[in-house]
Amino acid sequence: MSNDKYIHTDVEDKIYSYWEKNNLFKPTKNKKQFSVVIPPPNVTGSLHMGHALNNSIQDLLVRYHRMNNYETLWQPGTDHAGIATQALVEKKLTADGIDKNEIGREKFIEKVWEWKEEHGDIILNQLKKLGCSCDWSRNAFTMDENLSKSVLKVFVELHKKGLIYKDKKLVNWDTVLKTAISDLEVDQREVNSKIYYIQYPIEASSDFITIATTRPETMLGDTAIAVNPKDDRFKHLVGKFVTVPIVGKKIKIIEDEYADPEMGTGALKITPAHDFNDYEVGQRNNLEIINIFTEGGKVNENAPKEYIGLDRFEARKRIIKELKEKEFFVKEENIKNKVPYGDRSNSIIEPFLTEQWFVDAKKLSIKAKDIVNSKKTNFFPANWSKTYFQWMNNIEPWCISRQLWWGHQIPAWYGPDKKIFVAINEEEAKLDAKKFYNKDVDLIRDPDVLDTWFSSGLWPFATLGWPDNKEYVDKFYPTSVLVTGFDIIFFWVARMIMFGMEFLDKEPFKDVYVHALVKDEKGQKMSKSKGNVINPLDLIEKYSADALRFTLLSMASPGTDVKLSEDRVKGYRNFLNKLWNANNFLITNNCDFSKIDEKPILSININKWIYAELIETKNKIEKNLKDYRFDEAAKNAYQFTWHSYCDWYLELSKTILFSEDEKAKDEVRQVSAYVFKQILILLHPFIPFVTEEIWLNNKFDNTGKDFLMLANWPSGEFERDTSINQVEKIISIVSELRSFKNELSVSPGSFIDISIETVSKKEQSFFTENEIILKKLGRIKNLYNKDLDKPTATLMVSGDLFKVYFDEDVDLELIKKNLTTRQNKYQEEMNKISQRLANKGFVDRAPKDIVDQEKTNYNNLKNDVERISITIKGL
């Protein structure tokens, strides 16, 4: 290889182009299948760290199964992202001086498609930068013809079964976009607010009942005052009427357990049309529902005329002013509370009573719960199944209509008397209408579109060709695993399970792996406002896609958020260089890569040891990947490559490579190359670019497959024997000597004299046989079996007593003093941590990861203190 260092910018685009040109991402026929569907990113999106983690995990699994001879499909695609895309294109048109309402729906949709064709592949190209090996020939889009056909079929069939219906209910309403939105599109923000105390006059009395509210403007739609049945303060008022100030309407004081005696005054104004909890109270008590706002958030004709047409927040100011003037106002207090904002419009969301289309999610949830209960679909980590059931057991009707133009238009048409005809297309709707009216009539199509989550709920089977093309459905459905974030378990995962069970009577995936969040190095959520957002593309450019992938995978511990720092990525970039340098070492030492298809002869101890380590590492990686312990699998691969192979085996091998024993040298070259080849295969699913580059440069494969990506996963078993134990003893001795030098602040490169007190001839023969290796790696000048008259330190390693000799001018007392000072410092730090951990308040209030880190720090310091004690004792 020409480069001393690995230069990723010369490699990654080139390698990815090779893979694509050779169609390596397509499934190759085999008896067993492995399939994954990508969580479709929004077509408006750009790669963020959550995408990077999610897709690194998927690509690891896909590449691993491909190398294990599975017919592997990774189905890619993007989501049309109704609200996000429409808002973005509207903004662009407005900047160009174009009003969407003037050009009309059809022309506007054309503009959206134009934007999609120009910008829609940006995030897919960014996924390629990460190394994702999706079958791009099957790239799907939720507005594609086949996906649209699936959506229509599902809607029509669910409507026929009575599982889709139209109803008037309270929904999250965006007054800027003028559409219903899902809970996931609502951002609950903690803000500085005020709570207002207002008196409502009691009928036929000079008394008042005082309520507290953060939204006095909604009193225009009040239909009751609620008090708790157990609250004795209001028992004498239950059943009486009060007058709503300003409005003059009489409303009743009722009992309902929703009223909390500890909140506010204990008396609660009920506005069923503009609060979700109030709506439930209204349903239980058969209260009138009065909508007082327009779709744009202005006061409507149901309010006193002087308020009609006012913006809701302007109305609030006017109401407070009038309440004060009429002496109904008691006081106001500053508070902090959570207020719902639309994540696209940045406007405050209004609970709004409106007619919408709904799915009877409760009925669909029955099979969806059974499939998880029966373990046909399993969550990893398992505790996420509890979250799944909590949501499913409290499921509400799902509002699926949106007042947008971009999306799947609802296949419903209205007759002259507003009768609804649901059909696949207008022709069928007209035929149904003709049968109903006994004549041809004009129909008007419902202008609303479906919630984006409706179409993405069909993703696992619609992308495979359902309903018309069953070949891929039969082969790859159910999919093997879904990799997703916890925030969409209900919005997406549950709905895919519901639709999969309803239409294919099969779970859409066997496993659901739920990964954690990627946060900054301090454990804070990344946000633009905090200025702590780390762009994955910047890290890829600076350190390589492989370094970023390996960082994320090595930190993907179940239930623990990833605390990402640039230094970690930089550290794993060094790992790539270590691998690159190992390859250069093999080339320099004439290792032959063309003769390593079969397991080599293993007669030399270090060769037996590294082969045993290889098989053990392979087995650990397989188990950890099966258990979705990506962090442990990455650790296994890293430790074996960096420490076992590079730090130890290659160093041990130098004593043979630089000897005169040609037969031994040939075996070491063979084993070095063979094990390195297996390392490339083991590492490839984690770091595909650098491993493929080394593989292709060395022409490792002569089976015709050429590419590492298509190589077979390592196989083989190996039983450990005494020869392997000997190598491990050498490593243990050298490690202890190096640590001992470090404790004594002796230069690691300096040579020392050692004598060994052994208890058997067998042990003596071990040191005789391995004297050359021990001297070279342990930086030992002389190895004696007798005592010397010099300053001495002793240590025990693997049952043997070692005496380390120093030059006459070494001041052992000064060394002892320095060690004691350091030991005392560590002990002080231990005491401080011990006090913190004994403080129940700290343990209960501090984040779990902080407490765990303190425990780890304590144990590390304890080990250091004990180690120094042993060292001092040996001096």
From Swiss-Prot:
Motif 'KMSKS' region per record, residues: 525-529
InterPro entries: aa-tRNA-synth_I_CS, aa-tRNA-synth_Ia, Anticodon_Ia_Val, M/V/L/I-tRNA-synth_anticd-bd, Rossmann-like_a/b/a_fold, tRNA-bd_arm, tRNAsynth_Ia_anticodon-bd, Val-tRNA_synth_C_sf
UniProt binding sites for ATP: 528
One Gene Ontology molecular-function label: aminoacyl-tRNA deacylase activity
Signal peptide start and end residues: none
SUPFAM superfamilies noted in UniProt: Anticodon-binding domain of a subclass of class I aminoacyl-tRNA synthetases, Nucleotidylyl transferase, tRNA-binding arm, ValRS/IleRS/LeuRS editing domain
Coiled coil start-end: 810-875
EC number: 6.1.1.9
Entry keywords, A to Z: Aminoacyl-tRNA synthetase, ATP-binding, Coiled coil, Cytoplasm, Ligase, Nucleotide-binding, Protein biosynthesis
Principal EC category: ligase
Motif ('HIGH' region): 41-51
Cross-referenced CDD domains: Anticodon_Ia_Val, ValRS_core
UniProt-annotated location(s): Cytoplasm
GO CC annotation: cytosol
Catalytic activity: tRNA(Val) + L-valine + ATP = L-valyl-tRNA(Val) + AMP + diphosphate
A biological process term (GO) from this entry: valyl-tRNA aminoacylation
Taxonomic superkingdom: Bacteria
UniProt note: domains: ValRS has two distinct active sites: one for aminoacylation and one for editing. The misactivated threonine is translocated from the active site to the editing site.
Its biological purpose: Catalyzes the attachment of valine to tRNA(Val). As ValRS can inadvertently accommodate and process structurally similar amino acids such as threonine, to avoid such errors, it has a 'posttransfer' editing activity that hydrolyzes mischarged Thr-tRNA(Val) in a tRNA-dependent manner.
Family the entry assigns: Belongs to the class-I aminoacyl-tRNA synthetase family. ValS type 1 subfamily.
Description of how the protein assembles with itself and partners: Monomer.
Name under which the protein is recorded: Valine--tRNA ligase
Annotated source species: Pelagibacter ubique (strain HTCC1062)
